[in-house]
């Protein structure tokens, strides 16, 4: 007997996950297309209140082993849902996909953008941002709104990346690109951290504490505040990392912007004589700007 995708999806929204949720979880664009062509609402919530786009992007959390997240098929599934009108900001106030665990209450929860940031795929982050996903919102913990802890796409994405690498200097290229895209989209680099053990550390301070050297200049260029050392909050590891030679150079220079400006001037002095006979003089600063990570080292 043939199964009606629309009827199956409507039943699943009440009784539990079947084809629609599985198609979203696995990023199966063709299966999703069949449901949508049959008239299923693109923002139909599952029993836990998640929309297909949230599920496809991993807003429920890091995908378990066995799920292939970084695939062209998943990108196609996300693009399909957005093309059919899925809310890129599902999970936020006045949007579908809010937490419905508590009777009579709708609470903000992880958005598709947060899910893509956690799972570390820059392509899906870019697709969502182009579709209107907001990088700025910070939401309270839906399971404990009084805790005072908040979440943002930049925060959860960097936290996930730095924890995967144990603070290694070489954060993977996807996570670096994600952070850069979110900062350019207006994400707050000084937002509170998501980890309770971190106390009142901002994201900038948390990145220093865990030792994420590669993302420090990215956050600083985006307006990250470099707190004085020692921080006087009992985080001995933070104080150790805060004394890193790179950060000490910024202190001596008077801050990142001053250091960046001096770095630019040094490189211009070196390269201007070499390029002025090849290109107009006014283009040399642009070449330096796009060829080097000014202030990053």
Residue ranges with predicted function:
Residues 22-27, 55-74, 103-107, 115-121, ...:
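Ankyrin repeat A-helix N-terminal signature
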Residues 42-45, 88-92, 104, 135-139, ...:
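Ankyrin repeat boundary signal
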Residues 206, 217, 222-225, 230-297:
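Cullin-RING E3 adaptor/co-adaptor recruitment helices
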């Amino acid at each position: 007997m043939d199964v009606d995708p629309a009827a199956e999806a409507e039943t699943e929204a009440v009784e539990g996950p079947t084809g629609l949720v599985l198609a979203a979880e696995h990023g199966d664009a063709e299966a999703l297309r069949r449901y949508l062509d049959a008239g299923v609402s693109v923002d139909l919530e599952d029993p836990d209140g998640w929309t297909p786009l949230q599920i496809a992007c991993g807003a429920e959390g890091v995908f378990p082993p066995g799920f292939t997240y970084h695939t062209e098929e998943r990108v196609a599934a996300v693009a399909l849902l957005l093309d059919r009108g899925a809310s890129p900001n599902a999970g936020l106030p006045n949007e579908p996909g809010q937490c419905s665990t508590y009777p009579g209450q709708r609470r903000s929860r992880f958005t598709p953008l947060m899910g893509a940031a956690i799972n570390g795929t820059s392509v899906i982050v870019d697709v969502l941002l182009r579709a209107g996903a907001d990088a700025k919102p910070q939401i309270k913990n839906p399971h404990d709104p009084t805790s005072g802890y908040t979440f943002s796409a930049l925060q959860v994405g960097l936290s996930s990346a730095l924890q995967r690498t144990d603070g290694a200097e070489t954060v993977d290229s996807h996570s670096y690109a994600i952070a850069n895209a979110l900062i350019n989209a207006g994400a707050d680099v000084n937002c509170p951290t998501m980890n309770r053990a971190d106390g009142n550390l901002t994201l900038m301070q948390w990145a220093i504490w865990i030792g994420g050297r590669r993302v420090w200049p990215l956050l600083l260029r985006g307006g990250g505040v470099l707190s004085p050392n020692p921080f006087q909050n009992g985080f001995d590891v933070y104080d150790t990392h805060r004394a890193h030679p790179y950060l000490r150079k910024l202190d001596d220079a008077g801050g990142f912007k001053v250091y960046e400006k001096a770095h630019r001037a040094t490189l211009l002095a070196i390269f201007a004589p070499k390029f002025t006979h090849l290109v107009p003089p006014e283009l040399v600063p642009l070449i330096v700007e796009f060829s080097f990570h000014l202030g990053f080292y």
